[in-house]
Amino acid sequence: MNNAIKLNSIFTELSKKKKPKLIGRGIGCGKGKTSGRGHKGQKARSGTSINGFEGGQQSIYTRLPKRGFNPIRRNICSIINVGDVQRLIEAKKIEKNSVIDKEILHKLGFIKSIKDKIKLLNKGKLNERCVFHVDFASEAAKKSVTSIGGSVEILS
């Protein structure tokens, strides 16, 4: 038991705090005058280096080809499935026979903003009657909602 290592008895040279190297304090410190930056040139100047410069090698963004296209006026639609609504009804977050619109979906966290457009899709199964106020709806979703006795009202 006497040979056990204790935290208060451990001592190594590494545990001492290493003092920082003095830079730019005359030739006696070893890193004086130019402070390890060499003479003149772009890298000797103050400020940051060039973004994407790889020492003359062709940079990564010029090596890789351009791909794709991002339209400026892209229609961003939040998708809600009929099965998701059924799960919310079963979890008693939405009442049966209620009106489902942007405000309710925003409160439940289905859409990020009330300004987002909503599209109703027919994934899953709906057993309860509901009235939907959405921007878009697939034909299959409309058919499944109306077959139960609900309705889909297109806003836009």
From Swiss-Prot:
GO molecular function term, any single one: structural constituent of ribosome
Keyword Oxidoreductase: no
GO cellular component terms, A-Z: cytosolic large ribosomal subunit
Signal peptide residues on this chain, from the entry's feature table: none
Keyword set, alphabetical order: Ribonucleoprotein, Ribosomal protein, RNA-binding, rRNA-binding
Transit peptide found in the keyword field: no
Sequence segments annotated as region (Disordered): 25-49
UniProt superkingdom: Bacteria
Ranges of biased composition (kind: Basic residues): 34-43
Name of a matching Pfam family: Ribosomal_L27A
GO biological process: translation
PANTHER family with a match to the protein in the record: 50S RIBOSOMAL PROTEIN L15, LARGE RIBOSOMAL SUBUNIT PROTEIN UL15M
Entry similarity comment: Belongs to the universal ribosomal protein uL15 family.
Main function: Binds to the 23S rRNA.
Assembly and oligomerization: Part of the 50S ribosomal subunit.
NCBIfam families registered for this protein in UniProt: rplO_bact (TIGR01071)
Protein name: Large ribosomal subunit protein uL15
Organism the protein comes from: Wolbachia sp. subsp. Brugia malayi (strain TRS)
